[in-house]
Design a protein with these regions (language model features):
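Short loop/turn segments that flank or connect secondary-structure elements
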Residues: 1-180
Length: 180
């Protein structure tokens, strides 16, 4: 995980401690990993070395998952690779959530295989209520998405690598980046 992410997570932990709230998220839950995950191409580039270091068999398995998910998304008219911050995003999120597709990076134990470089959308999302609620809807009242910090980090990323700005649906981003 990058230093910026670590700083943000420490700040979130301090807020939780100060307000005496406990995040109910835990390793292996993975309900939120069935929501639409959008990321910048810069975040995608941070993931690339992890993919490149996989064994040939693991890379092929990931490639099959990515291509299968892209196909399912296209069949369900989720063809937009870039997500905009508009009403259209909510419609796409709803359609995606109903598909109940697990993130391509979830391993057999329902843990994130790229945890150290997971997208900002993933590390900035925390649930403080019943974990079962995350199975029912992508917009859970007891969750907090620490958007402000996420946006600050995202701005840094965009400044560092301005070409191809925007947010991409994870399977499409990986497919494009890996040229699959």
């Amino acid at each position: 995980m990058t230093t910026s992410y670590q700083e943000v997570e420490k700040q979130i932990d301090l807020i939780e401690e100060e307000f005496e709230v406990k995040c109910t998220c835990e390793k292996g839950c993975s309900a939120c990993c069935r929501q639409l995950i959008a990321l910048s191409m810069s975040e995608c580039l941070a993931i690339k070395p992890y993919i490149e270091n996989l064994s040939k068999d693991e890379r092929e398995k990931l490639k099959r998952k990515v291509l299968e998910q892209c196909h399912i998304l296209e069949e369900n008219n989720i063809t937009n690779k870039v997500i905009n911050t508009t009403r259209k995003e909510e419609v796409i999120q709803d359609k995606y959530f109903k598909l109940k597709m697990p993130c391509v990076f979830l391993d057999e134990e329902n843990s994130c295989s790229i945890y150290k470089v997971r997208p900002s959308l993933c590390w900035s999302y925390r649930n403080y209520g019943d974990k079962a609620d995350c199975e029912k809807d992508y917009d859970v009242e007891s969750t907090i998405k620490y958007d402000d910090w996420e946006h600050r980090v995202f701005e840094r990323i965009l400044t560092a690598r301005p070409p191809r700005n925007g947010l991409y649906v994870l399977p499409f981003a990986i497919k494009e980046m890996m040229e699959w």
